[in-house]
């Protein structure tokens, strides 16, 4: 379609919307200035650059389409290509396992700001801001329990990891002069029935209290709940109820992943309820098929309803938008 035809069609639509009291120019300007945080892990099937092994710990990618990113250079090239093809404003969301480790193994309780300085510089050069995630899965010490583990040695390992990740996020936020949003999600749970559910939740609460005690002005922490994970079907320590209570009580940002709820649950209905009790929301927009299958997001009814609720609540400044899916059966760049 020629530019003049598009312009003419828009002017007609603009006039119709104006009759209803809608300023389309302002709406487009708002859209252009509302960033979406692209998740780096779609580009390489959640493998990362720590061990080069498939994801585990309650999550799984399916498919074997060729062309996934094999190193940091390829991943950055893919993100640059995506940015060139899409209109709008973007951030980049990194997991800890995507650091620049110089060919050496750096365990997760040893990671530091120096492993992400290259990402900070790259993001600055490409006019992107960074967000971050601690990474509790796909590790020999992941097991079925991390921050909720009764074994103090393992629990302390993951507490130290998460503390270090918050400091990395703080450095990112200060470097880019804009808060880096760091998400904490742990897969902790059990495959079968659990006798003492309260015990594990008490441990998780204590771990989070210790982690979040450090004041880091360059970042914002958010906590993510989940219904269940593969191999952890019977019980999830960090359930929706747990994190709703924790975030409301402690004034912490809540992460709402659209795949982490019952299949028949209307996730968009959570927006207006959570906004009354938590300071901000982080959205991980996905498309669940019967469970948290992490299919590529579509602008379907569920997604439309989600964003309608945010706009109607005038909460675009309190609801941060991010993507979270990983489909290895299609072109990785096209997936964005």
PLM region descriptions:
Residues 1-150, 157, 166-168, 178-180, ...:
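Alpha/beta catalytic barrel-like cores
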Residues 96, 186-188, 225, 258:
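Short glycine-centered, acidic/aromatic-flanked micro-motifs in structured strand/loop junctions
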Residues 123, 162-165, 169, 173, ...:
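Hydrophobic pocket-lining residues that define ligand/cofactor binding sites across diverse proteins
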Residues 128, 174, 252:
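Short glycine/serine/threonine/alanine-rich loop segments
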Residues 134-136, 188-190, 227:
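Short, flexible active-site-adjacent loop segments at beta-strand->alpha-helix junctions, enriched
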Residues 154-157, 161, 199, 203:
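Alpha-helical initiation/capping and key positions within long helical/coiled-coil segments
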Residues 166-195:
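Active-site groove signature of glycoside hydrolases
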Residues 193-302:
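Acidic/histidine-rich catalytic cores of soluble enzymes
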């Amino acid at each position: 379609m020629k530019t003049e035809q598009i312009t003419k069609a828009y002017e007609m639509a603009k006039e119709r919307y104006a009759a209803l009291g809608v300023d389309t120019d302002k709406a487009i300007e708002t859209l252009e200035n509302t960033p979406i945080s692209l998740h780096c892990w779609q580009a390489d099937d959640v493998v990362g650059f720590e061990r080069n092994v498939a994801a585990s710990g309650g999550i799984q990618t399916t498919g074997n389409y060729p062309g996934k990113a094999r190193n940091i250079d390829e991943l950055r090239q893919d993100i640059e290509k995506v940015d060139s093809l899409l209109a709008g404003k973007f951030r980049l969301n990194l997991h800890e396992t995507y650091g620049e480790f110089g060919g050496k193994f750096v365990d997760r309780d040893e990671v530091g700001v120096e492993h992400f300085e290259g990402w900070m510089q790259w993001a600055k050069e490409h006019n992107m801001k960074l967000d971050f995630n601690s990474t509790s899965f796909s590790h020999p010490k992941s097991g079925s329990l991390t921050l909720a583990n009764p074994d103090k040695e393992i629990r302390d390992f993951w507490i130290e990891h998460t503390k270090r990740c918050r400091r990395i996020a703080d450095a990112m936020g200060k470097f880019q002069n804009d808060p880096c949003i760091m998400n904490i999600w742990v897969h902790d749970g059990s495959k079968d029935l659990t006798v003492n559910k309260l015990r594990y939740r008490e441990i998780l609460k204590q771990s989070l209290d210790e982690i979040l005690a450090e004041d880091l002005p360059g970042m914002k922490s958010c906590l993510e709940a989940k219904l269940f994970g593969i191999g952890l079907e019977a019980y999830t320590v960090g359930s929706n109820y747990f994190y709703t209570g924790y975030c409301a009580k402690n004034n912490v940002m809540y992460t709402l992943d659209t795949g982490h709820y019952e299949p028949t649950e209307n996730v968009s209905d959570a927006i207006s309820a959570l906004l009354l009790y938590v300071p901000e929301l982080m959205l991980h927009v996905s498309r669940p098929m019967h469970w948290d299958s992490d299919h590529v997001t579509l602008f379907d009814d569920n997604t439309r309803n989600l964003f309608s609720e945010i706009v109607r609540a005038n909460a675009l400044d309190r609801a941060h938008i991010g993507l979270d899916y990983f489909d290895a059966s299609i072109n990785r760049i096209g997936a964005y």
